[in-house]
Amino acid sequence: MALVDFIPVLFFAIAAVILQRDLYNKMSKGAFALFAAGTINVTCAGALKATWKLLYALGVCDFEALNAMFFPVQSIGFLLAGIGILAMLTHKQSKSAALAVVPPVFSGTFVFVGLMVAGLGIMDAVLCILAGKLKKPALIAIFILSFVCSLCMGYLSSQDFAEASMNWIAEGVNVVGQGTLLLGICLLRKNGLADYKIREEKAE
């Protein structure tokens, strides 16, 4: 089961790289920096937690710090990515870099869950908007499914399941969520996202 944790991390990492390549020429340096830093944070957080589970399963050690940093790093990462991709649509892009302000470290999980939901929601909403502009409404359903799966995974990951079957369900939901995200982004790319001109449309 520990190895399965790396599958959604890999899916998200591939999806993030594809988006970074396709959106690079559509973002200002500041917006792209926020988006890139956010997606890197999310990928690293997932990889570190998966590594913690693998080390624990193999009986090597219980490196709790890898698990403890998951929520703060991932939630702030989603928020930064969401702000960066939203800025691409809502603000006139310039060459100047943006200043990223993040909240101080907090021990509770409620704040981080809120940040994660907000950032992930913004990111999926912008992807739905892009799908609509490319006249591919079917992709909107894919991104909505990905968002719903991510919300379910967020709830499931906060529960303490004694049965292995429930952990497998949580892993399955996570794989489906990140898999649909990757599928949607690949289809956006296939349908011309890389060549889509956001600035020209706004100017018209």
Language-model segments: residues:
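Conserved phosphate-interacting/catalytic interface
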Residues: A47
